């Protein structure tokens, strides 16, 4: 094998010693990464340029390594020494270039490791964000449940307040009815008192009339006694006169006049006695009738007074009972009014507390929604960065694998075409320049295609991540599928470009 192939195999073996074989490198590079989009784009540009420079330098070294001395017998030792020095210089330059490329590739791999570390940190943060995004649902459920409980309590308080208002209205109507009844009873009591006063006046009049009648009866009795005394005196005088006249007549004509005088006296006495009896009977009858009338009036007045007193006593008892009942109802009404005021104050305080709680919960919900939207935007940005890094890493991996495949196939074909120990094949400078231009143009075209694919992937990811609120898992699955498709298309394009070169 020639010097260029040995040098390439040595470089490839040094790559494998430092970074492992291609399978481990591809597995390590295929992991997700995370960083800012600006850093990833600058890294992709620098790495694509370094890859293109590495490809051109490797192809140039390959072409120069396979140059052989011309097969002329007249080559002197000075030309051989010049060729040897030229080969040494070229080899030294190639070693320096490969060393620089190795250093740059090591820096690139270190950056990849850093990106992997950042990717793991971002994945942990994404898991935390998902967990935090899953929490607001429970917060919403708790908020809805507490809101339902508060609404139920508010409805219970409203129903209790309505019931208390109905009871208050009923008690107010009862108080109005009792107040009207009390006023009616008061009016009845006043009428009874007026009637009692009138009856008392009548009783006083009857008493005065009875006293007057008693005085009249006493005067009549005195007059009757005086009349009787006068009558007795007159009768005695008349009898004395008659007796004197009879004695005188007896002296005149005792025998003839005695029977007639006795009969006359008897008749006069009988007349006076009948007149006195009639007067006494008439006086007694008048007194008895007057006394009966007065007794009847006094009995009626006494009965009326007794009924009035009983009625007054009954009215007083009813008034006292109604007063006690009114006082009790007034106290109950005042207590109910105080309870209603306390209920209204407590209800107002509870409603204010519930309103404050609802406002606090709504503000918390708005904050949670804004925080969720911010986390969704951060997640979308991180997902865009992750997709861009996945695309870049997949493109770099495919480019490296394609370069390794191209160099290995190119070295084998050249070694198979030049089996002689001293081949006289020399690559012309035109072929070397065309190869370098093809490599650089392929690198630029690949870079442009990669940028276009990255823009398309970012647009696709931005379109898909706009629906993150509907489902994180669905968006993530679609992004992974699009990443795989993009990596596959990049692999196919890099393979086709390597085959064309």
Curated annotation (Swiss-Prot):
What is this protein's name? Alpha-internexin
* One Pfam family cited in the UniProt record for this chain: Filament
Q: Where is this region: Coil 2?
A: 263-408
What are the start and end residues of every segment in region (Linker 1)?
130-142
The chain residues annotated with the modification Phosphoserine are 72, 219, 335, 498
Which family does the record claim for this protein? Belongs to the intermediate filament family.
- Known partners and oligomeric status: Forms homodimers (in vitro). Forms heterodimers with NEFL, NEFM or NEFH (in vitro).
Can you provide one Gene Ontology molecular function annotated for this UniProt record?
structural constituent of postsynaptic intermediate filament cytoskeleton
